[in-house]
Amino acid sequence: MSDSEYLTRAEAALAAIERALDDTDADIELERSGNVLTLEFENRSKIIVNLQPPMSEIWIAAKAGGFHFRFVDGEWRDTRSGTEFFAALSEYATQQAGEPVHFEA
């Protein structure tokens, strides 16, 4: 994947997260600084989603751990488990919010 393809796909993922948070009733604050999204929950815990252009990856840091995602076969997939990005982010956010939170592309 070229650098421009990576950036287009990765930016689309960040935009999908922003849209989902606009539509949710969960109390999650969103801050964007460049290629980094910070989701802060009511309990003050955070999830950090950041782009890693040199690696062509998206990284998530959550209470559950650190995870790297690479674009494979049309989806962002965890480089270790193969879990789809939005499914994983939904799970981590649900755990930290204490209520269902859903993200999708």
Swiss-Prot record:
Keywords: Iron, Metal-binding
InterPro entries, A to Z: CyaY, Frataxin/CyaY, Frataxin/CyaY_sf, Frataxin_CS
GO-annotated biological processes: iron-sulfur cluster assembly
Iron in keyword set: yes
Top-rank taxon: Bacteria
Metal-binding is among the record's keywords: yes
Alphabetized SUPFAM superfamilies for the sequence: Frataxin/Nqo15-like (SSF55387)
A cellular component annotation (GO) from this entry: cytosol
Pfam families assigned to the protein according to its UniProt record, in alphabetical order: Frataxin_Cyay
Family from the record: Belongs to the frataxin family.
Function: Involved in iron-sulfur (Fe-S) cluster assembly. May act as a regulator of Fe-S biogenesis.
Name of the protein this chain belongs to: Iron-sulfur cluster assembly protein CyaY
Organism per entry: Paraburkholderia xenovorans (strain LB400)
Gene for this chain: cyaY
